[in-house]
Amino acid sequence: MSVREKMLEILEGIDIRFKEPLHSYSYTKVGGEADYLVFPRNRFELARLVKFANQENIPWMVLGNASNIIVRDGGIRGFVILCDKLNNVSVDGYTIEAEAGANLIETTRIALRHSLTGFEFACGIPGSVGGAVFMNAGAYGGEIAHILQSCKVLTKDGEIETLSAKDLAFGYRHSAIQESGAVVLSVKFALAPGTHQVIKQEMDRLTHLRELKQPLEYPSCGSVFKRPVGHFAGQLISEAGLKGYRIGGVEVSEKHAGFMINVADGTAKDYEDLIQSVIEKVKEHSGITLEREVRILGESK
């Protein structure tokens, strides 16, 4: 029995797509094919999938919402798992529990509907709840570490564990999940009671700021670089005269130099080449070495 036949038999009922182009699922609109793109409907299907992959020595990874990711043009080998069907969100008192595939922005709106404060900072951050925990996403002085109560994960060995914020060892755009290989299943956020109108005003203010400053009208991978201590990446790039600097179909945004936008059918290679060139030119200009925030995955073509 071939691996494909075994896969279809053992993983019967799970949505598996073979040789699926990933550019359709990426915010950058670039990326080659996944060998197997999988859409589990619940944690049990996810556990079955991970168990099968481990038994058959097939590599696997969770892509999240692909909002702060560049998938290389050669694609990704093995299983690529999209958890957007694991998207239930519930409210219990001042606590919100969200599955990993829940949309982060929509989760902040649920907090608003229940007059819960603490989540406003994330009201414009694209991506999934699981990806936000993985990266310790943050903006405007807030971050996931400030509100996370606990997190349920599937370990790389297929076991389910509950982790505290301390266990996750949060840092700037970092969590312990990045090293552990675990998959976020669900998250509990501890919020506080607030006033609906006040929360809405703050979310509207932050949304307006984001729309004003960020090139949301183009495909992009969000913030490309981490914030250097004592500086802003976008400012350093701008001071190096790189606004509008372009390689292939990808350019440094004129609106916000911390963003690289896909303006003309750019490729992942265009993104990588532009990122490397910007790092070198900023280093020459200011002596500061920028560090990537965006993750680059897969194989070159």
UniProtKB/Swiss-Prot annotation:
Its cofactor is FAD. Residues 30-194 form the FAD-binding PCMH-type domain. One of its GO terms (biological process) is regulation of cell shape. The active site is at R173, S223 (proton donor), E293. It is found in: Cytoplasm. Transmembrane segments: none annotated. The keyword Transport does not apply. One of its GO terms (cellular component) is cytosol. Its EC number is 1.3.1.98. Pathway: Cell wall biogenesis; peptidoglycan biosynthesis. The keyword DNA-binding does not apply. Cell wall formation. This is UDP-N-acetylenolpyruvoylglucosamine reductase. It comes from Streptococcus pneumoniae (strain JJA).
